[in-house]
């Protein structure tokens, strides 16, 4: 019989590995089937292909950010009410309802206003057909991606972190295989990459839905059962996760515009390659922060505050070690990572330089992500929101306004490290006050 994880009294190191490892592997596999598009599209379509994907993807990223908000916000509430089936089912139903409403609105906006949306995010007349070719199939499958993203958080909160990981493994494996077939064997171009992503997302969502067959979770979407108060609570707790994820889209748009203005499609392509490479390390720290949340929120709900503090300190120690290792790997092996995407010498050179500059953000990014996740898990959404908003919008924007004036294109690369450094400085006083 499978041993049940004891969140309250179990060995901390074992619990940490049991929850953070599947969450981290899941997100790294998400990176792999996202980066598979980048590799196959760059090799099969050209550098303009990856620039097109990088312009269109922020909209998909926006919907994923919303579903992550619903999933983590709802899953945290479910963990607080562990054992209370009535409340668990209500929270679960609200998670699904919110995803359905958002998908309908976003899909309608994409299909009705494609051209102005893509042009606003940095596309030009040359890239627009490619962007549309990628976006249309992906938009159709985004409903499944949203459900899978939210359900991943719920499944983890239901003491099944490995099942959440398996769903991502299925999606990643299918995406890589189908990318190769559709782009190189069937010559479907950028649309082939979109079809591969769409099919893999559908498969992952279907697998996750199996977890709830015969479980205590029951879906009830009747209007009488829906509560705006519950929706507000879910959004309040999950909002920092939305900001962190949506920040990827916002930062991508801002930097795309800055790079296009500074050096055209070449610079935007270099940023696209760097963005894919950096995503691996970002996923590592996102996985750690998301994985530890169920442990923190469960013990916080049981008022076991000493254990909550111990978990935070332990997680920061692990994060520090991984940050140092990650930076060393990027400095010495970063050029080999970007070379996977393209063989163009000048593009590899600029991407490798940009990768190192951009990745200095890792010195503070892991620290920030863990703190934000901790604040969510201990029901401090206001402070978490302030930190997220400052990092994702205020500090990045300030960096883009100031740094390029002194260092040109290098200043654009350094805008994210600047934002994460300033966020860490802002966070420390809040953190000291809370953990006393």
Task: Enumerate the language-model features and the residues they cover.
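Small-residue hotspots at the loop-to-helix junctions and early N-terminal turns
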Residues: 47-58, 131, 135, 194, ...
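Short runs within selected transmembrane alpha-helices of multi-pass transporters and secretion channels
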Residues: 137-156, 164-175, 193-208, 286-289, ...
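N-terminal transmembrane alpha-helices
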Residues: 7-45, 58-73, 77, 100-107, ...
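Residue-level signal for transmembrane alpha-helical positions in Major Facilitator Superfamily
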Residues: 17, 32-33, 70, 109-113, ...
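Small-residue-rich hydrophobic transmembrane alpha-helices
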Residues: 50-108, 145-164, 270-328, 332, ...
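Short alpha-helical transmembrane segments in multi-pass integral membrane proteins
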Residues: 1-23, 78-141, 185-239, 296-361, ...
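Helix-terminus/linker motif at the lipid-water interface of multi-pass membrane proteins
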Residues: 32-51, 118-125, 181-188, 249-280, ...
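Transmembrane helical elements of multi-pass membrane transporters/channels
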Residues: 18-37, 137, 148, 171, ...
């Amino acid at each position: 019989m499978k041993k049940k994880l004891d969140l309250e009294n179990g060995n901390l190191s074992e619990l940490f590995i049991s929850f953070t490892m599947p969450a981290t592997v899941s997100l790294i596999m998400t990176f792999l089937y996202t980066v598979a598009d980048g590799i196959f599209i760059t090799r099969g379509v050209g550098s303009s292909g990856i620039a097109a994907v990088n312009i269109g993807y922020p909209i998909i990223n926006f919907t994923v950010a919303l579903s992550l908000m619903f999933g983590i916000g709802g899953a945290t509430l479910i963990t607080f009410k562990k054992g209370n089936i009535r409340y668990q089912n209500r929270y679960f139903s609200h998670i699904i309802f919110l995803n359905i409403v958002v998908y309908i609105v976003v899909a309608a906006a994409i299909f009705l206003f494609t051209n102005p949306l893509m042009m606003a995010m940095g596309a030009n007349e040359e890239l627009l057909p490619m962007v549309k070719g990628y976006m249309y199939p992906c938009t159709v499958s985004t409903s499944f991606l949203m459900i899978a993203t939210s359900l991943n958080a719920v499944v983890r909160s239901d003491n099944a972190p490995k099942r959440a990981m398996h769903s991502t493994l299925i999606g990643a494996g299918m995406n890589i295989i189908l990318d190769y077939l559709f782009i190189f064997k069937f010559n479907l171009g950028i649309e082939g990459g979109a079809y591969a992503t769409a099919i893999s997302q559908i498969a992952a969502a279907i697998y996750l839905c199996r977890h709830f067959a015969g479980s205590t979770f029951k879906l009830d979407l009747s209007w009488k059962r829906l509560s705006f108060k519950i929706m507000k609570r879910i959004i309040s707790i999950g909002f920092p996760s939305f900001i962190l994820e949506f920040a990827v889209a916002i930062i991508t748009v801002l930097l795309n515009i800055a790079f296009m203005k500074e050096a055209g499609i070449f610079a935007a392509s270099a940023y696209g390659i760097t963005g894919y490479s950096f995503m691996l390390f970002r996923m590592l720290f996102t996985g750690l922060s998301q994985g530890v949340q169920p442990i923190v929120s469960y013990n916080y709900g049981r008022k076991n505050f000493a254990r909550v503090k111990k978990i935070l300190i332990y997680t920061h120690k692990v994060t520090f070690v991984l940050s140092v290792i990650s930076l060393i790997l990027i400095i010495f092996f970063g050029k080999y990572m970007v070379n996977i995407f393209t063989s163009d010498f000048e593009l590899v050179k600029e991407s490798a330089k940009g990768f190192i500059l951009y990745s200095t953000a890792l010195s503070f990014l892991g620290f920030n992500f863990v703190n934000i996740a901790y604040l969510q898990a201990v029901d401090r959404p206001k402070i978490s929101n302030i930190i997220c908003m400052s990092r994702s919008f205020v500090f990045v924007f300030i960096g883009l306004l100031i740094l390029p004036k002194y260092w040109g294109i290098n200043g654009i690369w350094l805008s994210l490290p600047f934002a994460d450094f300033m966020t860490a400085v802002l966070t420390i006083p809040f953190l000291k006050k809370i953990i006393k």
